[in-house]
Amino acid sequence: MLSPRQGLLRPVGCGVEELRRRRREREADPAVPVVSPAGDRGKGERRSSGQPSSRLAAPRDTADLHQELCLYTLGNLIVESEAGRRQLLPQGIVPALASCIQSPHLPVLEALGYALSQLLQAKEAPKKIIPSVLASSIPQHMLRLLQPGPKLNPGVAVEFAWCLHYIICSQVNNALLITHGAVSTLGLLLLYLAGSVQSPEDAGLELLVCPVLRCLSNLLTEEAVEAEGGQVQLRDERVVVSVFILLQFLLQKHPSLLPEGLWLLNNLTANSPSICTSLLSLDLIKPLLQLLPVSNVVSVLVLTVLCNVAEKGPAYCWHLWPGPLLSSLLDTLALSDTDVVGQSLELLQLLFLYRPEAAQAFLQQSGLQALKRHEEEAQLQDRVLALQQTALHR
């Protein structure tokens, strides 16, 4: 059984569209502005500059340029016309895209990623489109284009990372992606991003952070991950360090995306004592607690991760207290958000269960008074009463 704390992320945009627009404007020909998609991630019109790109590794001919323009046009038509999408499958759109994805030209690949991402977001995609895509060679080529290293192209990788995200969220056949090595590829890409996002030379890579975090978070909820050894691949301490590097990066640059990193940390810690051990041995509890004031959503996720650690048993709770945890929880009890307070109550219950001395410290620091303010809240009454009894009888 999966831990109830594990959860899928929603297959929606996450606020990175503005980042994508700025990157594309930096790369575009100044004489031909890029038309940024609007609304949800990637949905909307995009135009090619119609000019050879300076990023090409090989000369382009008219056929390549024509192919790129056709793919962008196709992507825009997919957004605009459901009737048009219905005609694409019988006309062989998936085999055509599978052929195009083998192109050596980066602008063609980026245009292909755009068109494919529009196709995968169609409402009928889970039943009528994604099964055909998974049955083709496209997934293997997508993962190849996401391999970290000097050949990784940010524009191409961003498009295909979002494509992978839409496929994973459909839950059509994630076991197949795992068999193709998706967890390993994404794990290595996570390490690569953590070492690259702060570098001005790799500015485009910051756009990869959100889809990579989401893909990994969602794949970790699949039972096939255990069967293929995916959890073992992600138990490396470097994964934990990389997540925290990215959390600090997001806190400084894009705080609205912090929940993406915390969801991954939540799903990593839910069923992995070794990841929880890494959190403690690397002294990362304090940095986690420092995220509590960011927002209520962030607070709930931080507290959930800490619950994952605490529920592993007495040895883990010995590392949680004494320390700053108790005072931080008393601060959260002063809040009015029932989700934050409820998660704080659960964490305190676990802490008192395995560290009775923490209950005594809680009482000495006016913990009962902090609980009283929530006694009349219907959603919290039972948990408040249970915690009061636990604290008084430890």
Feature locations, PLM:
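Helix-loop junctions that connect tandem helical modules in alpha-solenoid scaffolds
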Residues: R55-D64, L97-P107, H141-N153, L189-L205, ...
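Alpha-helical solenoid repeat architecture
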Residues: A38, R46-Q51, E68-E82, A96-C100, ...
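Exposed, low-complexity/repetitive linear segments and helix-based recognition motifs
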Residues: C14-G15, R22-R26, L65, P107, ...
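Structured C-terminal portions of repeat-based eukaryotic scaffold domains
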Residues: Q231, T277, I285, L289-R373
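Intrinsically disordered, low-complexity regulatory regions
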Residues: M1-Q51, D337, L345-A359, L363-R394
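Elongated alpha-helical scaffolds that mediate protein-protein interactions in large eukaryotic proteins
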Residues: A38, G44-L69, L77-P95, L106-A111, ...
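Extended acidic/polar regulatory tracts at the flanks of large eukaryotic scaffold/adaptor proteins
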Residues: L2-R5, E17, R23-R26, N174, ...
